[in-house]
Amino acid sequence: SWTEFRNSTLHYINLAQEHFFKNNQHEFNTSFTMATRLIAFHQLGCRLLKHEMVKKNLRREARRLLKKLITSMARIGVNSNLFFCSPQRISLINQLAASRQSDPRDSKVSITSTNTTIPDPSRSSASTIPSFLNQESPARPIRNFSSSTTDTLMFSEDWQSNSPNLESPQEIPSTRTSVPSLNAPLSFSVIDDESGILVQSLFQVIDTEFFRFKKNVVKLHDLMQAHFGQGDLPQLFPRFFKGHFNEGAWTNPFHQGYEYGSAQNSDSSPVFDSSQQQANDSLGNRSYSVPSKDHTSFRGFSVSSKATSTASSSNAKHSITGKPSHTRTFSRAKIMKRNRYPLNGDTLNLLKKKFNFIIINYYGNDHRLIDQPKSKKRNLELSADTYKALNYIVDMIEVLENLDLTFFVNLRNMSHDEKLDRESEELRKHAMTSLASTLMEFFEIKQALHDIAIRQIMDVQGLTLDDPFVFCAIRDESVCYFDREDELSKYQFLKQEKFAEELRNLLISQDVEYNDLAFLDADQLVREAFAKFSDIGNTMLQNVEQLIEERENILNYAARMMKSDLTAALMKGEQEKWFEDEDFDMASSAEGNENLDFGDAQNKSFSRDIPWYLDSEHEYSLIYDNKGNIKGGTKEALLEHLTSHQSIDLSFNLAMLLTFRSIFTTGEFLQALVERYNLYPPEGVSYEEYNIWVEKKQKPVKIRVVNIMKTLFSQYWTPSYYEPGLDYMIGFAQLAKSQKISGADVLLSAIKGRLSMKGNLKNFVPESINFSDDGSSTTTVPQSSRSSVSAPVGSSSTTGFRMRKLKLLDIDSLDYAKQLTIKEHSLFYKISPFECLDRTWGNKYCNMGGSKNITEFISNSNHLTNYVSFMIVKQTDIKKRIQLIQFFINVAAHCHELNNFSSLTAIISALYSSPIYRLKRTWAAVPEEYKKLLEELNTLMDSAKNFIRYRQLLKSIGDFPCVPFFGVYLSDLTFTANGNPDFLHRNTVLVNFGKRVRILEILKEISVYQRSHYKLKRYEDIQAFIESSLENLPSIEKQYAQSLRNEPRTEVSTGLNSTNVNYRYNTKNGPENRNTGKRLKFGKAKKQSANLLSQ
């Protein structure tokens, strides 16, 4: 912060002043050098905040204070060198020491906030000043040191308030009557002739400038502290820093405050705000970071970093002069849009293609060239190949920098989601734990590619050097000095000889030949650089592949656990579409179609030859797709089509009645239907035309309105739709009945029954909806009695075993699969469309009454998964584990035969869960035919491309009984509702009705499989066994701990060590990867970790 900056600067300047009074040139130079560095950082900090300072009109004041600081710093530096080099001072050292010993007042000091005891220059008496400085001269009035000021320097903000106005040297509170100006040149003749007077003047100037220096430091601090909020400094050290970094060519999606698709707050801290970005751009700052494991927060999954910079020294020079470097380049870069590469197999293949091209076409040839005798031709060819390969390396880095890691960012951000259920939170924590090292390694690989690209250029350039140490930097800031106070009294050497001896010793300490160092072998460095790049490239491909697999595994596991909300949250913001079929992408198709397609002409009123007064008023406000189905329209047009007098659109009616609550409120919808019932004739019709209008439009519309209301209240009503003030609907039904509208009496009875319940969901039993294409959407069996429909043909209470002796392996795998199927189908049959809508919308539009049956169905499947994994992992005997694995694979195969895809998915998820799949010794003993069968079943239920294999199989089942995997429907509903806009063409006028139609299609498909029933025999003892076994199961974390006890983890240590290169290259097949792998979470291979920072 600026406060810490101020304290550090005053600390070092006080130390410098203390050593100045003590005549300690060495310590003075050290402290004063640190103070000058801090002043340079003050200037850099103001430079980085220049945009904000211009907005706040602070730039002129800051420049004035900085100019004063630099002036004081220069005066102190020049005059202190003259002072310490003065022969008069050297000859009077002993006199100064004697004066200090004889006068006890020398101990009068002021205590500063740095806890350092130093002489207070504003309170110094005559005895504390060397006698040679106390000489009087008529030519130059001397300060009267007998009287002192009462001002004391303080670090706190009270310094400025307690000090008088000190804007000019004349106003300094002291008895100084004259101070020599530095504007007049000081010649050596003056030093020789008037040495005493000059030394006294130098002391006074330095004393004054120290005072001014401190005053201006505090003023600059107060200025910045008052106008920049928390007082945070901008980023001054692009080479080394802690925390998050996302600048220049380095991208870090885990950067603090970074969100996809949103801009940062302009009022944020100067460290991260937009002005900081502009300042960095103007400085030509191209900094890259490497995450540090010491600064990684696993709670939030935030990747912190320490960065190493590749910014050149020329860019730093630009920052000092205030002129932006590469202005034109960065102004173009700001408007350049980066493409995000999805985390999938296509991106991995692209990286492999680029990497193999580099190895085969460039580095393969370079390995042959480097073994040839040294020559200019060889070096030139090596340099040419390296610079050509650099273009492809940059392309690889570009892909890595823009790799879409939104999935893992979402996983991190979900830690604060209070809506996350316990199982989802356990899955998230488990995934975060196993992913942390992989993501850290990804950032290390990125930095390693940056480093190796630069290293290759430097090493190839070194081939042309006669002296390979020409680019080696000598240690900076080395000061050659000797303390003349004591040394001259001991040794009778001339000053020049002593200085030369110190310089010689310094150069010898830095000479390579005197430090037992070997000269570099440039050819060997090039070989190591090529091999290092190959190792980094191989590790990079493995790491990206593992990230892809981890993402797919988590999605697959979440989908199989039927966590649709979790899946949607994880995929939020990703570019990849969930639905491959373009029919599902309603948002893009609707918004991208500016030329409206009105579909089949014979179904549209405006394409027929009908009288104008019978035409539909809002027909032109509807949008149709290529199949003639309504895709969108205004609310008025949709209601007109719902009660059309010309034709009945059954599919449209079903979709509207089922999803109307997402378009209207209940009161709006019913009031619009009442207004539609009270239709008025158009103006300008004749008597004959009016009679025709009544017969062909008004009466049909009234009948349609009554039928729609009747269907709504009898089949599609839920107490969640109730709103106060709907009692007028009873009067409307009575009016329709008095007008002898068909179905009005049934409507009146339905309205009275539904409104009497008001909003009471406790005793409400939804009716089953028949989604038939013939329009006979009639009420079937109430949900309360639906369980009896799925009852088996026969039942038995025993299977030949007594229940108290019944064990899992005593049950035949086919019988176990059948009983699981009966149980799953019974739970599946109870699910109603309103529960599906509740899962889809939540409380967005209204409280749909919850989804108890869906929750029970999902819990049963997840408990089955936990039970399967627990039964295997709790066995300490490897033979029993193998036996149980074979049993459950057989059960899964039988579930497949029975079309019970719910239990099939649950068992596969258990066998591929981390506690089970990591048991290498156990799986090695499982027969190959079982592993092959399991792999086939896993491929069938793979979530790749939105369960495309499973969907294809499901379509071929037809009317056979089936228990579908309900997670697919939940995902379809979630992504249809959340992945498509409610309105088309980016406005709130055209309702996206195609989105509602898609929801109806999903609910129709669910209802198809609910109508098909199994004819299986129910065994009560097995059912009771299954019920009891699915209770009180340990969590996945406890099971994983038990798995580690059964088969402890084997440590594998390998990496990219530049000193031991394990690289083999095949010119035909490309680089060979000799790294072995190990299995991690969800059964996927995890590559061996590598320490890429070892150089």
Swiss-Prot record:
It is found in: Membrane. The chain crosses the membrane at residues 959-980. Promotes the exchange of Ras-bound GDP by GTP. This protein positively controls the level of cellular cAMP at start, the stage at which the yeast cell division cycle is triggered. It comes from the Eukaryota. GO terms for cellular component: plasma membrane. The keyword Kinase does not apply. PANTHER family: CELL DIVISION CONTROL PROTEIN 25, GUANINE NUCLEOTIDE EXCHANGE FACTOR. Residues 309-319, 776-798 have a biased composition (Low complexity). Residues 103-133, 158-178, 263-295, 309-333, 773-798, 1044-1078 are annotated as: Disordered. Keywords: Cell cycle, Cell division, Guanine-nucleotide releasing factor, Membrane, Mitosis, Transmembrane, Transmembrane helix. Residues 109-133, 263-290, 1044-1074 have a biased composition (Polar residues). Residues 812-1049 form the Ras-GEF domain. One of its GO terms (biological process) is Ras protein signal transduction. It comes from Lachancea kluyveri. GO terms for molecular function: guanyl-nucleotide exchange factor activity. This is Cell division control protein 25. It is a single-pass membrane protein. The keyword Membrane applies. Residues 626-756 form the N-terminal Ras-GEF domain. SMART domains: RasGEF (SM00147), RasGEFN (SM00229). Pfam families: RasGEF (PF00617), RasGEF_N (PF00618).
